[in-house]
A protein has these predicted regions:
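Residues that flank catalytic or metal-binding motifs in active/ligand-binding sites
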Residues: 2-5, 67, 115, 122-125, ...
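Extracellular/periplasmic catalytic domains that process cell-envelope and extracellular macromolecules
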Residues: 1-4, 39-41, 54, 120, ...
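Flexible, glycine-rich surface segments
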Residues: 90-92, 96-150, 154-158
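Carbohydrate-binding/catalytic loop surfaces
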Residues: 30-33, 108-121, 169, 174-176
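Active-site-adjacent helix/loop patches that line small-molecule binding or acyl-intermediate pockets
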Residues: 1-100, 123-127, 131-137
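Solvent-exposed loop and edge beta-strand segments that line ligand/cofactor-binding
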Residues: 55-64, 114-120, 190-197, 215
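Short, gly/Ser/Thr-rich active-site loops of penicillin-recognizing serine hydrolases
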Residues: 218-229
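Active-site Gly/Thr loop motif
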Residues: 100-107, 151-208
Length: 229
């Protein structure tokens, strides 16, 4: 585990062992650790940090909540290590600058942000966040994301390529860097439960936000095709 880098964690390539529904060998008779982080009443940061290694880092891509949880843990350690308030950090350093006033990020019972899910904003606010990535991390002349960060987020993660599933990038973005049969040009997106998504399409200077019911999740791809000229 000491060989795991922050970059591996942010590409869902840490190799940390939990069972998750997207695993090829997932046992459907078990309750996934992936969901236990939401429902178990545990300190999710300590739980994720205590999991053993299953694969060498940066060799296998797996969609597992422990990786974004560990990233959030590192952020909390860094923010509080500087003597700053952790719970106002996202609002002060990002949302206020983008004009987002009503973002809600839920926490576990220990006050740790559940950044891997349960983040709520209006469609316009998700579009603001998407536009930050469309403009290479610069907003109103101020660089909010490090130079090269957007390229990192939108580039397919090496471990996922090796694993034969080139669908995940950096910074917890899903990527589609080929024009496939769906006709959607290269894009990357923030994706949530039930088909909630914010898709960034650089070639069209376009951000598309979808917020809706779970029952409409299967129609998202068709809707995107209709929106793109």
């Amino acid at each position: 585990r000491r060989d795991i880098r922050i970059g591996d964690i942010m590409r869902m390539s840490s190799g940390i062992m939990i069972n998750a529904p997207s695993d090829p060998d997932y046992d459907t008779s078990t309750y996934a650790d992936h969901f236990y982080l939401y429902t178990g009443g545990v300190n999710q940061y300590e739980y994720a940090a205590s999991r053993p290694a299953e694969y060498p880092p940066n060799t296998i891509g797996r969609y597992r909540n422990t990786d974004p949880v560990l990233t959030n843990y590192l952020i909390r350690l860094a923010v509080e290590g500087r003597g700053e308030d952790y719970h106002s950090f996202p609002q002060r350093n990002l949302f206020d600058k983008l004009g987002i006033r009503n973002a809600l990020i839920e926490t576990d019972t220990y006050g740790n942000f559940l950044g891997q899910g349960l983040a709520f904003m209006s469609a316009r606010d998700w579009a603001r966040l998407g536009n930050l990535y469309l403009t290479d991390g610069v907003w109103n002349g101020e660089r909010l994301l490090p130079e090269g960060y957007v390229e990192y987020a939108s580039t397919t993660a090496p471990a996922w390529v090796t694993d034969g599933r080139p669908v995940y990038g950096g910074a917890f973005f899903w990527v589609d860097n080929d024009v496939g049969d769906d006709g959607i040009p290269p894009s990357f997106r923030m994706s949530g439960a039930g088909g909630q998504s914010t898709t960034i399409i650089p070639s069209h200077e376009l951000v598309i936000v979808r917020i809706g019911k779970y029952t409409g999740a299967s129609e998202v791809g068709a809707a995107l095709r209709q929106m793109i000229p």
